[in-house]
Amino acid sequence: GQPDVDGDLEMGNGSVEYYWTYDRHAYTLLVNIGNDVYSAYRQDDVDRGPFSDDEAVGICQTFVTSRDAVIVDISSTISDMARERGLTNEGTINLALAFVQSIEYASDEATAGHDEYWRYPVETLYERAGDCEDKSFLFASVIEAMGYDAVILLFDDHMAVGVACPGASGTYYSMGGSKYFYCETTAVDDWELGRAPEEYDSAHVVQVG
């Protein structure tokens, strides 16, 4: 699916609008992504996969871009939204998770013609679609930019994100004395922090902050 963009996008200063709901409230987020910014990520010669487990662990951090200006802008806006609603840390994480979950799930085969093709967060935002890896990198980037501690959770045929949130409950993975609660970025039915599919058990936990 092509993004809903205004006519200025061809000039390199367009915008993409996102709509999602969380806890019965509707949210709108306008994201400005210049063509030059998108193209720089799109044309980056980084390896896009497929990867062995060891390779995947080693390269995950490259795709988490929490210092990117677009990501910083999004994280700031979502933080403001959460403050206005008086959300707790857990609620704030879930608000950001609901945003990423609202982005269309699409397989790499459908979107890139490859079995595996990892995207940078800006690519996923611009294209308004991604698979579990793409959406996990986006969510981890936004959450890290918001000041939380995130890890990538690597499974045999899946990827998710873990976020440290003291006081939270549910499925978590331990690393370095912290509990990272499972976040399913591809869910479509309001799965929140700590809720994980039963089939995913042991994971490679990759620090990306």
Question: Residue locations for each model-derived region?
Answer:
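Extended, composition-driven regions rather than compact fold-specific motifs
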Residues: 4-22, 66-80, 84-90, 102, ...
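Solvent-exposed, polar/charged alpha-helical surfaces in well-ordered, non-transmembrane soluble domains
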Residues: 94, 98, 130, 134-141
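Secondary-structure boundary elements
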Residues: 57-127
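Linear, non-domain "peripheral" regions
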Residues: 1-72
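Intrinsically disordered, low-complexity regulatory regions in eukaryotic proteins
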Residues: 8-31, 113, 123, 193-196, ...
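Hydrophobic/aromatic-rich core segments of domains that either
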Residues: 134-208
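Short low-complexity stretches enriched in small and charged residues
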Residues: 48-56, 115-120, 139, 182-184
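A residue-identity detector for tryptophan
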Residues: 20, 51, 118, 172-175, ...
